[in-house]
């Protein structure tokens, strides 16, 4: 579980959390709401390890894998499919490990220990889903509104909004126990939005999402976390259930 106990969090001279205490349980889908500038994105920075608490105790299980949509505009000639496949960090790590072992085996083909390592590396890669990585990535890309003929198109050939859809697909491709989403519906049309809602409803891990879209939050979350006056308040229900007012999008 994720726990904050009497956490103090500052950005420069501004105190964003002052003695905040809350617990989020595994598998909960949380809508993080609050006025613009209240500290929602800063809390994400605490969760992903970019920032550290200035006081109190904060913990996320060390074994949890985390996924988050990169906010930078991707600049690459990689195909859309290859770019999204690269979001599977576990697969990438295993591919790199396999390449290193294959190089060692080429240099010492009679070394039985290296041969055994090579066999284990192939097994690990298969267990991680190497065989269906491409179709899994392409299902995400198509679900977010791309056409079949665009699957092999270079990322740089797309406009900014479509590239950010690819960043979203890349985050969804990453095996994760904790998924952080900051305004994920930006750049999405209705069909892609409906598809994303269905995907997130099936997601088995813990999810925390920032959004100004009340209907979207109602569709994909079951817990609401409200940040206001440097405190966190947890509600057992969607944002509509809590009757909280969402700020207009900045």
Positions of predicted regions on the chain:
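ABC ATP-binding cassette signature C-motif
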Residues: 1-244
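A short, hydrophobic C-terminal helix/tail in secreted or cell-surface proteins
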Residues: 245-250
């Amino acid at each position: 579980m994720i726990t904050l106990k009497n956490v103090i969090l500052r950005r420069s001279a501004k105190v964003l959390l002052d003695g905040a205490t809350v617990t989020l349980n595994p598998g909960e889908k949380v809508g993080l709401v609050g006025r613009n500038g209240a500290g929602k994105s800063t809390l994400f920075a605490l969760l992903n390890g970019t920032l550290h608490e200035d006081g109190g105790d904060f913990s996320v299980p060390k074994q949890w894998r985390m996924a988050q949509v990169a906010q930078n505009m991707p600049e690459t000639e990689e195909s859309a499919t290859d770019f999204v496949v690269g979001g599977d960090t576990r697969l990438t790590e295993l591919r790199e490990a396999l390449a290193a072992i294959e190089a060692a085996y080429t240099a010492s083909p009679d070394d039985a220990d290296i041969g055994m390592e090579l066999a284990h590396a192939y097994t690990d890669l298969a267990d991680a889903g190497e065989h269906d990585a491409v179709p899994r990535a392409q299902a995400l890309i198509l679900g977010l509104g791309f056409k079949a003929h665009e699957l092999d198109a270079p990322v740089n050939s797309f406009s900014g909004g479509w590239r950010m859809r690819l960043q979203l697909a890349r985050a969804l491709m990453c095996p994760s126990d904790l998924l952080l989403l900051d305004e994920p519906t930006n750049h999405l049309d209705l069909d892609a939005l409906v598809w994303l809602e269905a995907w997130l409803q099936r997601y088995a891990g813990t999810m925390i999402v920032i959004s100004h879209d009340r209907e979207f939050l109602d569709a994909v979350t079951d817990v609401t976390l409200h940040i206001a006056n440097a405190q966190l308040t947890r509600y057992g229900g969607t944002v509509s259930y809590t009757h909280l007012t969402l700020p207009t999008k900045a």
